A protein has these predicted regions:
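Substrate-binding groove of N-acetylhexosamine-processing glycoside hydrolases
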Residues: 18, 44, 56-62, 86-455
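Substrate-binding cleft of carbohydrate-active enzyme catalytic domains
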Residues: 1-120
């Protein structure tokens, strides 16, 4: 009840200030009738929303398996023959694969539900169909399917993880000027799979805006930018704001203007540092999949410590460390008490936190060589030693992060890291090291390494 009341107040607050409010939910695989009933419940609860998006659940390769026959049967069941047999819709179908049948089925359910809802002319909000799919061949087919099934309905498209992936995927999915007019693009200011690392999404959003501005008709319905926090994202969010007003704004020009406003004198090294963070962001999104995922469920069985690549961790860590050292030198040149000093101090803090997070992960993945079905006393002791050291580094991460709590989002990050990756590592320590979950980080006080950046 509290959550519903809070959301109502938030929506009413936004409406009073003239904002357009769009609500989104995942019907998932249920009946058309149940989906329509859920829509009515949502509109009864939140009558002031302007639009309601019915979006597919995320498709990324981990879903249920399916056969060609099953997917073709789904197409024939939900869509007209001309749609079901469209070459672009059928292009990603294989004899055996994961996810695609579920994705197409959800589009079928949503499209039928929207058609039924649109028959009632008294319905107030605009209905939109959302697609969240990070497998580009699937995205192409799904987007084409949605456009053919609902040509007068806006499609909300989340085509990848991170802004760089979005910029790469969009040109092969959204093909025509009419497609652009009927598409709401989801991009990213911040990716939830890297929540515990400092991020910079500017290069990807720069490329996306260039793609839009270079097209013969640069009209697009709208662009939605995913993000969860404010303090960590002030620079990336500012770029997204300026780029949507002027798509010709380059990243370098933006950085120079940003540094000017803050009176940062060493603009060259500031730009270099921010580009390094951007590079680390792109690399981690691609090669350290969900290493900082803020969803607790990802860590329910322990998490990614058993398969994450140490080489990739080292590579990302080096980039962050180089960025941190540049920022540290710039910070020394700024006067204490100035906005530039506060801004750079915060970024230095979060870059250092990123290094510490990767240090903890780098230590924790050493369990890969000692875990197994038949743990010996020796291997259990080794697992415990590895986990204890990693947990102490996580303690360093939390302590450093807590030095600069700019807003509730910063506080929430601490709660999240404790309940997700730290808890996940304790699950492995209990499972393979025989240590109860409620035991502190270390009983033996293994020395944690010194902090890599001092400022």
């Amino acid at each position: 009840k509290f959550a519903l009341s809070w959301m109502k107040d938030l929506i009413n607050h936004a409406k009073k200030r003239g904002l357009y409010v769009q609500f989104s939910f995942e019907p998932r695989i249920t009946s058309v009738e149940q989906t329509v009933a859920t829509v009515h419940d949502i509109l009864k609860t939140y009558p002031n929303i302007d639009a309601l998006e019915l979006i597919t659940e995320e498709t990324g390769g981990w879903g249920a398996g399916c056969t060609r026959a099953e997917t073709e049967a789904t197409l024939n069941n939900f869509f007209d023959k001309s749609v079901a047999t469209d070459s672009a819709v059928n292009a990603p179908i294989k004899e055996k694969q994961s996810d695609l049948n579920a994705l197409y089925m959800q589009i079928g359910i949503i499209s039928k539900a929207i058609k039924q809802l649109n028959m009632d002319k008294t319905m107030h909000p605009e209905f939109k169909l959302g697609i969240y799919c990070s497998i580009t061949p699937y995205t192409k087919g799904a987007y084409r399917l949605a456009r053919l099934a609902l040509p007068e309905t806006k499609i909300c498209l989340m085509s990848s993880h991170g802004s760089e992936g979005t910029a790469q995927a969009l040109p092969s999915v959204v093909l025509t000027s009419q497609d652009r007019k009927m598409t709401e693009i989801y991009s990213w200011i911040e990716f939830d799979g890297l929540m515990y690392l400092y991020q910079n999404s500017i290069s990807g959003n720069e490329k996306m805006m260039k793609w839009l501005s270079d097209s013969s008709d640069n009209t697009v319905s709208s662009i939605l930018f995913n993000h969860w926090r404010s303090a960590e994202n002030r620079t990336s969010a500012r770029f997204a704001t300026e780029a949507t007003l002027d798509a010709t704004v380059s990243a370098e020009r933006f950085y120079r203007a940003y540094a000017n406003r803050l009176s940062i004198t060493d603009k060259k090294r500031f730009i270099e540092a921010m580009q390094l963070v951007n590079r680390a962001d792109v690399f981690a999104t691609t090669n350290l999949g969900n290493i900082g995922f803020c969803w607790m469920g990802a860590w329910g069985n322990g998490g990614s410590y058993t398969w994450m690549s140490k080489d990739n961790i080292d590579y990302a860590r080096t980039i962050y460390l180089n960025a941190g050292n540049l920022l540290k030198d710039i910070l020394k040149q700024t006067e204490k008490g100035t906005e530039a000093n506060h801004y750079l101090s915060f970024i230095c803090n979060r870059v250092l936190c990123s290094v510490l997070y990767l240090d903890a992960f780098r230590e924790a993945v050493n369990i890969q060589g000692v875990i197994g079905k038949n743990q010996t006393a020796e291997s259990q002791a080794k697992v415990k030693q590895i986990c204890d050291k990693a947990l102490l580094i996580f303690d360093q991460y939390m302590a450093k992060h807590a030095e600069m709590l700019e807003d509730r989002g910063c506080e929430g990050t601490l709660v999240s890291v404790w309940n997700s990756p730290i808890r996940g590592l304790k699950i492995y320590r209990a499972q393979f090291g025989g240590v109860p979950m409620d035991v502190p980080s270390s009983l033996d006080a293994v020395d944690a390494p010194p902090l890599p950046i001092v400022y």
